[in-house]
Structures are given as C-alpha cells and as structure tokens.
Amino acid sequence: MILKEEHPHQSIETAANAARQAQVRWRMAHLKALSRTRTPAHGNCCGRVVSKNHFFKHSRAFLWFLLCNLVMNADAFAHSQLLINVQNQGGEVIQESITSNIGEDLITLEFQKTDGTLITQVIDFRNEVQILKALVLGEEERGQSQYQVMCFATKFNKGDFISSAAMAKLRQKNPHTIRTPEEDKGRETFTMSSWVQLNRSLPITRHLQGLCAEAMDATYVRDVDLKAWAELPGSSISSLEAATEKFPDTLSTRCNEVSSLWAPCLCNLETCIGWYPCGLKYCKGKGVAGADSSGAQQQAQPTNYRCGIKTCRKCTQFTYYVRQKQQCLWDEXRRGELQLMQMRCARRRNGSEFGDDASATCPGGETRAATTTATITGGGAGGSGKDTTAATTTTTNKLRQLLLLVQQQMPFALWSFPVHHISQSHHQSQSQHKPSRQQKQHQHHSQVAPTSHHQSSSSTPPTPSTSSSPPSSSSSSSSSAMAAIVA
C-alpha cells in the first residue's frame, strides 16, 4: 500500500497530541517573554494578587493571537502537498507534485517530462472541469519562440480522481520510494472543436483565465463538453458558446502530412500521467456493540473505513487546429518513421525484401516470408544466385531508406543527390560484376561436393546448403552506392 490514510481513532489521537504540544510551546514562549521584561511573578490588580497566566488569558492581545493562529492553521490544513517519485515506461524517474485545496475544491498535479515539457493538470470538482496545460520548449534554430503554451479544458468525471478532502488526508510513508501505478487505463483521445476566449471563460470555470493566461490563442474545448456543462445547475449553453470560437470546417489534413511550415493543419499532442490516485480502498473494522430499546445487548456490526488508495496511469491525446505547422513541429518527428514503414510494406508486398520483421509490420508477412525462405533453401544449384540478388537488393533498398529518412528529418538541407541514382548505380554494378550461370553453378558444385561426400561416408542423407557469406557483387554494389551517397 503506497499511501495510507490514518485510522479514524488514530487521527483523533494525533490531533489531540498536536494540540497539547502547541499549547506547551505557546506557554513556554510567553513565559520566556515575561521573564525578559522582569515582570514580577504576582501583581496587584485592584487589591488582588494575580498571576502572569491570568493576565494573558484575560487580555485582548491573547484573543487576537488565538484568532490569527486559527486562521493560519486553517489555511495550512486547507492546502496539502505530496511529492511523488514516479518511474515512467521508459525507466526514467520524474517527480510529481500533487496539491489539494479543500477550500476551492481543487487538485493540482504538476510534473516536468524528460524533454523539458511542463505538464500541469487542474481538476475543478465544483464545475466538473479538468484543465491540462502543456508548456513545450521551442526549437529556436527552426524559428520558434522559447516556448509555447497550450491549454485543454474537458469534462471531468468525479470517479476518475479522489476528492480534494480525501487527498488532503493522505500521508506518504517513504517519500524517497519510486512509485509505479497499479492499473494502466490506456489512452483516451480528445478531438477539440473550438477555441476559448479567456476573457469570457467565467461560465466554464474561473480558474481557466488565470492558469492559461499565456495561451490566449491556444486554449481549446469540445462541443460535447459544452453540452454536458450546460446541464449543470446555474449554467446555460448560450453563455458557454459565447465564450468559444469554432474551428474552420474545411480543414482535415494532419500536420505530419503537410510539407509547408506556414500552412494550417491538425496537430496531435500526447501526454501521459504516470501516477495518480484514482480511487479509495476500504478496510473492515470492528464496530461498537450497543443495546436496543429493550435493553438487550446487540452484536457489534463491522464498519468500513478508508485505509488506502488505488493508483492508476493514463495517457491522453489531443487533436486540435493550428494556424501554422510551425506551432506543431513535434508531430513531424513521426513522419519519417511512418513513411519508412509504408515503404517497407510496399516492397514486401512486391517480394523485393525478405526479413523476419515483415510479419510484425505488414499483414500477411508470415506467409510470404515462409514461402520465400523455402524457395531459397530448396533451390538447388540456383540457390546461391538468388541469395546474391536478394542480398544486393536488400542492401540497396536500405541505403535508399536511409537517404529518404535523412531528407525528411532535415527539410532545410540542400540535397543535390537524387535517390534514384542509387538504383542506377546498383544496376550498373550488377551488370559489371554479374558472373555467368556456369561459373556460379561450378562454384556451387565445388562447395556442395565435399559436403555431400562427407555425408555419404557417414550414411546420412544429404541436405541442400546455401552459402552464408554474400558474394563479391553484393559488396561491390554496396560500396558503389555508399560512394554515391558520400559524393
């Protein structure tokens, strides 16, 4: 159990001990102050002898002092904070800060990702609003500012997070322990449909304007959530819609499919909260036996009390409109991987590349890989020639993939070498270094003959074998293609 709540009886005893210690500290502090002023132990007040404690108890300063302490302690009890060390799926450890505000009925969760992105999640239980703020560091070498801020306001379901009152009562036994969640809730996708005008965002929640002041043009909301908030008491759909501005209806292009940095597109931003308290755990306790109206003794009924929490992990992906692709450069990083995967699948469907990863990427790859392997293994005298062609083609395709990936990741570089030159150099080198069929058969028989003779002497049936090392044509083709890339 990671975080444990205090037992009801234990919490009462703890509060009583804290009150006694505070009273003792207060009395000692004021006794020292009196001794410094050399006040006599007893004084005369209208002919009566009074003590120092009597003076403080009946003075107005003492009453004001108690009132100020109560106010300060109430504010301290209303805000509680936990620092949690969380290990993400990549094995890296980040620190989460979870703050509970009972007076405002708020919970704030904040952490910084390993790439520098600052994530802030605010949950407003009164208005059932969840705000996720992302501060992403910019790429100054590509013309971006130092950072950009986005805010996403969505409908919050009260069962997804423990209440602010329960959060304030949680205590951490070992603050330095690295936490892992008990349950993974997967990924939830939100498609935003409107901007939020922060100067009119009061009908949604009054915390939105202060939290997202740096995201004046980058605060987003969904129409579905507006309709859900309109059903709450004291809210109306007209006031909610007046605080929003809808996206253009004609755009449906993803940013990772757009080449121009100044064209509008749909951006994707994904973030994961690696650890948060998503529910409460209850323990059974012994009840107090009592008597009924007739005086008969009743059996003690077991009672349930809160004794711990359930922890979860959840990822969220937001899809929203940006006026320029320049505001969504992080979505471009997956473009090269996606295109490279599509190229591999297309070549495997044509039978031009063989590999173990074909079945994991393209549908139907297992059948094609098995058929191709069986054909190469049982090819007889022509097996080595097929291996040579397959190895040469695979090497050339990998070089082309590498060049395409570098061009996609560096759009501002001036590449004067076209990709199709690799295929041309491959055909030229293949025509120059291609041996005759008789020479290949002679080499194959010279390699297979000793093996078959040795196998016949041991009275075992011969098995067809293929050469493990690629011939010289593959190495010459690879070297010529690599020289073309370097040029």
Curated annotation (Swiss-Prot):
Positions of region (Disordered): 423-487
Organism: Drosophila melanogaster (Fruit fly)
Biased composition, class Low complexity, residue ranges: 423-433, 456-480
Residue runs in coiled coils: none
Source superkingdom: Eukaryota
Tissue specificity note: Embryonic expression is in small clusters of cells along posterior margin of most segments, brain and segmentally repeating pattern along midline of nerve cord. Expressed in embryonic, larval and adult gonads of both sexes, and larval imaginal disks.
Pfam families: OAF_C, OAF_N
Family the UniProt entry places it in: Belongs to the OAF family.
Function according to Swiss-Prot or TrEMBL: Vital for proper neuronal development and hatching.
Gene that specifies this protein: oaf
Protein name stated in the entry: Out at first protein
